[in-house]
């Protein structure tokens, strides 16, 4: 039979893994990462230090739990950062394809699907997630001014705009 400390660590690992998947791939928000950081700093750190005074075994279990939750929080932030970097690279490729389309046809495409298959093989997703914020939004203007291309870096707000002609980024919350 497993020791009580190992059972608690196994439960903490499962909880941390579930929160990681929910936060990084379903919500695409650092909500649970921030909650986990707060729990580690406000509960586990003081509780571990307090337990060190009398029960080193309990302190080790609490320290291990703190490490598990801290690792989950950091992993969420890293995953979301990697997803946003991936979306940035894909937006630049879409912008380049729009500029190539304009050079050939003397106007911007009406939508991103007009770029397929001549300029890009398919319209990519911005990020991977289940609750939105995973696609690029493209708005073409009638007067052939630069179209708008953005994705939700931090749903439901936090839009990251790519300016094709200047090859620069803007941010709107």
Which residue ranges define each predicted feature?
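Intrinsically disordered, low-complexity segments enriched in polar/charged residues with Gly/Pro
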Residues: 78-80, 87, 124-125
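A broad, low-specificity signal for short, low-complexity segments enriched in glycine/proline
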Residues: 62-63, 97, 109
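Short alpha-helical segments used as structural interaction elements across diverse proteins
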Residues: 5-7, 57-62, 87
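N-terminal start-of-chain detector that recognizes signal peptides
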Residues: 66, 73, 87, 111-112, ...
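Low-complexity, acidic interaction segments enriched in glycine
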Residues: 2-54, 103, 107-173
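Alpha-helical transmembrane signal-anchor/signal-peptide segments
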Residues: 83-104
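Internal/C-terminal transmembrane anchor helices
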Residues: 58-83
């Amino acid at each position: 039979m497993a020791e009580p400390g190992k059972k608690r660590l196994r439960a903490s690992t499962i909880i941390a893994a579930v929160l990681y998947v929910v936060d990084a791939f379903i919500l695409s928000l650092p909500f649970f990462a921030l909650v986990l950081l707060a729990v580690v700093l406000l509960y586990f750190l003081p509780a571990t230090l307090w337990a060190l005074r009398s029960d080193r075994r309990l302190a080790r279990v609490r320290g291990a739990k703190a490490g598990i939750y801290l690792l989950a929080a950091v992993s969420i932030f890293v995953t979301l950062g990697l997803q946003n970097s991936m979306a940035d690279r894909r937006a630049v490729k879409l912008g380049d394809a729009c500029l190539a389309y304009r050079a050939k046809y003397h106007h911007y495409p009406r939508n991103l699907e007009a770029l397929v298959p001549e300029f890009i093989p398919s319209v990519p997703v911005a990020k991977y997630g289940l609750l939105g914020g995973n696609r690029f939004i493209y708005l073409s203007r009638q007067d052939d001014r630069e179209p708008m291309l953005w994705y939700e870096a931090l749903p439901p707000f936090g839009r990251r705009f790519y300016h094709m002609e200047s090859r620069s980024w803007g941010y709107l919350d």
